[in-house]
């Protein structure tokens, strides 16, 4: 599956993103019997069913939520979906605007924004804009990055614009006009700690990522 990335026609393709996902996964299944059972169960799922896609996306988001509940040391925090929807209702994004989350976690903000905008897409061009030129995110943690990509794919965005990087490590002076976005939908990256080199990017030099 990792070869998907090498054989893809470009980074903005479903094949490339699938390769990204499996490139980050380090788990191994040593029992052939267990692997066969997993494959058999997976084969019964209809991934083209919108209902099953949403169920799977909820499972991925629950994983992030459980990571946070197990202890805040990992810096994983789950934002309740009703709160996200309320924020989107206040902002009222429009098709053609770009939406960015610099610490996107499971991409809950981006998924909910897509669900808000999708009914407003009356033309094929609108759907193409939502698919390719609307939602952008960055995520530092490997597992959350993988879950974000899977979550967006399951919601209907086939080639998510999610980058595996630490947003706080970027020098503000290097940000160009093309890197700007119309809307930022995000929570501060609660619960994390940053090394001193990263702190140099900010006027207030503290390790706490939320500040």
Please give the residue ranges for each predicted region.
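Phosphate-binding glycine-rich loops and adjacent basic patches that engage nucleotide phosphates
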Residues: 1-5, 16-26, 44-53, 106-115, ...
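Non-catalytic, mostly N-terminal accessory regions of nucleic-acid modification and defense proteins
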Residues: 1-95, 161-170
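Mobile active-site "lid"/loop adjacent to the S-adenosyl-L-methionine
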Residues: 126, 190-211
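Conserved S-adenosyl-L-methionine
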Residues: 74-186, 191-195
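Residue-identity detector for glutamine
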Residues: 2-3, 50-53, 92, 131, ...
